Amino acid sequence: MEFIISATTDIGLTKNTNQDSFSVRQFRSNYGNVVLAVLCDGMGGLAKGEVASATLIRAFEKWSEHQLPQLLRNGLEEQALQRDWNQIITENNEKIKNYGKQTGINLGTTVTALLITGTRYHILNVGDTRAYEIADHIQVLTQDQTVVAQEIACGRLTPEEAERDPRRSVLLQCVGASETVQPDYFSGIPRQNAVYMLCSDGFRHQISTEEIYQYLNPACMTDSECMKKNMEALIELDKQRQERDNITVVSIRTY
């Protein structure tokens, strides 16, 4: 399987700093082509959310350089991958918490990580950044770790009510601000001629699922230039509708 990758980010209308961080890397190995994409949405006082998100991104990048090659040589066993990723989350939860204690600032970050090969994708999720699969239809591959998502699951809110709920952005946990962090894991078989997309919550609040599909479906995402242009068009639509948050989106096109 081959991949085309593209990503873009925008500070948005009101923030002084961009607290989102992302990384997307493609590797060629004996296991075939592999892409690792990670997106983090930081939060914290005095713009220190960017410290939390960048810290976690660097940890995943370091892992991809030093541990991932061995995992690939061993056949990318799912339990071994989750063990590595759990260690990254645990270590950096403590690291960011300690930084916060030293500086007197509360900070933390969400994270969605996607590792995709020709035969399998693996996703880690903490918080409300998301992963989508866009093919003949659009599907959310992650579950938000938020108060409103929990309320929807319990039948106390409808999805439409959740979009207007003042608790919409209240997280159940995040890396650096929780005593312990339990990531959610998802995996599946990647589809050819599909788009795998990661986004921060600022990207999706002001646009509909139908609009995401209209701009980011595989027929519209034929090369990296088209991909970036279409993602930027949706970001501009977000801003026209007065989205106040930072906005980040990463796309991986399979073929």
How would you name each of these model-derived features?
Residues 1-255:
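PP2C/PPM-type serine/threonine phosphatase catalytic domain
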